Every structure is written in C-alpha cells, then in structure tokens.
C-alpha cells in the first residue's frame, strides 16, 4: 500500500512532469490557451501513458535490451494512433483544435521516460498506475494553466467544452467577466511562460511551507544516555 501511495504522490505532486521535471513544455505552452484544450490533451496524454506503461511492462521480459528504445517508440506510436482515431471519431472539434499536438505525443519525453525508468522494471499494474499518476499530474498542471489563461484572456471558463464532452457540455461555459477585446498577452506564448513561472513559484512556496511544518512537528532527537534519566 505504501508503494502505491508513493507512486501516486510522486506522479501528482513531488515528481510532477510539468512542474518539477519540466518535460513536455511544447504542448504545455502551446495548447493551454483554454481549459478545454488543456483538459483534452492532458487526458489523451494520460491514456497514452497508462496504456504504454502497461504494454511495455507486460512485454519487458521479451524485449531485447539492445533495441528496447525503438520498440518503446513503436508501442507509443501505435497507442497514440489509436487515441488520435478515437478523438477524431468522438470529439472532432477537439481534434481540429489540438491539431498536430496529438500525434506529437509520440515524441513527448514524459512517455518514453516513464517507459524506460519505471515500466521496464516493474509489474504491469504498478506501471499502469505510474502512467496514470504521471498523466494526471501533467493534466492538472495543464488544466490550471489553461484555466488561468482563458479567464485572464477572454473572461470565460470552459468555452468550447461541448467539443470535448458533447452538446450537453455547453451549459458548463461560465462567463467570469465580459470583455470586448481579449487580453492577448494571456492568450499568446509569452503569457503561457509567465503563467508557468508563477505556478512553479507557488509550488515551491507550498513545498517549503510543508517542509517547514514537518520539521516543526517532527519529534526532537533524544541525546544518547538521556532516555533513562528522570
């Protein structure tokens, strides 16, 4: 149970692929102009990570070490192709919006890195959990950044949610404030860099506060020879 908890905590927070490892920055900065786009690509990446880790782990005993990386890339490309066809079939609006960034998941360092560092050494179910946790950690970071940029840029949240979830999701659109001219800095790549920098700073402050709190609540060490004294 402790290993499962550690995998989840590492993926979601301590070893977050976007906020700690700073991997996959190209889609993170390019696609997060809206919360819907960020959530769509994040969930697609999570599905790819989970299925890839599961497959790599299941085949690890029969994968020659000398050619393991090309085999990993072939597995990732197959999974990404299947996910791309699913999005094309069931969320065509999102498919058009994400464009080239769906097939580019193949080259994402997160996917190859987890296959090599974890799935090639652990069992299938732990590997699937690792892929899911890492993917949800990245999805969370992308969603927060996309939400901030959409609110600051357009004054809305979940605009275009119907392209991801279907026609009923139009009711999810929220207008935070009305604006006739979008705040372009928030919508363009410089705004994404600034937003990511602020998120990194907030995570650092939270980590430091948690570290300080643990140090204050930790029991002080008892000097040797003092335990028997009254």
From Swiss-Prot:
Membrane topology per record: Multi-pass membrane protein
Protein's cellular compartments: Cell inner membrane
Quaternary organization: The complex is composed of six subunits: RsxA, RsxB, RsxC, RsxD, RsxE and RsxG.
Swiss-Prot/TrEMBL GO biological process terms: electron transport chain
Organism: Salmonella typhimurium (strain LT2 / SGSC1412 / ATCC 700720)
Function recorded in the entry: Part of a membrane-bound complex that couples electron transfer with translocation of ions across the membrane. Required to maintain the reduced state of SoxR.
EC top class named in words: translocase
Record bears the keyword Transport: yes
Entry keyword set: Cell inner membrane, Cell membrane, Electron transport, Membrane, Translocase, Transmembrane, Transmembrane helix, Transport
InterPro entries linked to this entry: NqrDE/RnfAE (IPR003667), RnfE (IPR010968)
A GO cellular component annotation in the UniProt record: plasma membrane
The protein's Enzyme Commission number: 7.-.-.-
Regions that span the bilayer: 18-38, 39-59, 63-83, 86-106, 125-145, 182-202
Family classification: Belongs to the NqrDE/RnfAE family.
Protein's UniProt name: Ion-translocating oxidoreductase complex subunit E
């Amino acid at each position: 149970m402790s290993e499962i908890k550690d995998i989840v905590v590492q993926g979601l927070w301590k070893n977050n692929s976007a906020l700690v490892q700073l991997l996959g920055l190209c889609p993170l900065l390019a696609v997060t102009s809206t919360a819907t786009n960020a959530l769509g690509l994040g969930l697609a990446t999570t599905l790819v990570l989970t299925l890839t880790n599961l497959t790599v782990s299941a085949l690890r005993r029969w994968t020659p070490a000398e050619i393991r990386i090309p085999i990993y890339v072939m597995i990732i490309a197959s999974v990404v192709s299947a996910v791309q066809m699913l999005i094309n079939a069931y969320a065509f609006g999102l498919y058009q919006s994400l464009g080239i960034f769906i097939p580019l998941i193949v080259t994402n360092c997160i996917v190859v890195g987890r296959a090599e560092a974890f799935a090639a050494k652990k069992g299938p179910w732990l590997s699937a959990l690792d892929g899911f946790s890492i993917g949800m950690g990245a999805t969370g970071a992308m969603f927060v950044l996309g939400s901030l940029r959409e609110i600051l840029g357009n004054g809305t949240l979940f605009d275009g949610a119907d392209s991801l979830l279907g026609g009923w999701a139009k009711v999810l659109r929220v207008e935070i404030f009305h604006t006739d001219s979008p705040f372009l800095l928030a919508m363009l790549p410089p705004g994404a860099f600034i937003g990511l920098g602020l998120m990194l700073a907030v995570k650092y402050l939270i980590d430091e506060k948690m570290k300080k709190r643990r140090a204050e609540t930790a029991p002080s060490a008892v000097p040797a020879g003092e335990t028997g004294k009254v």
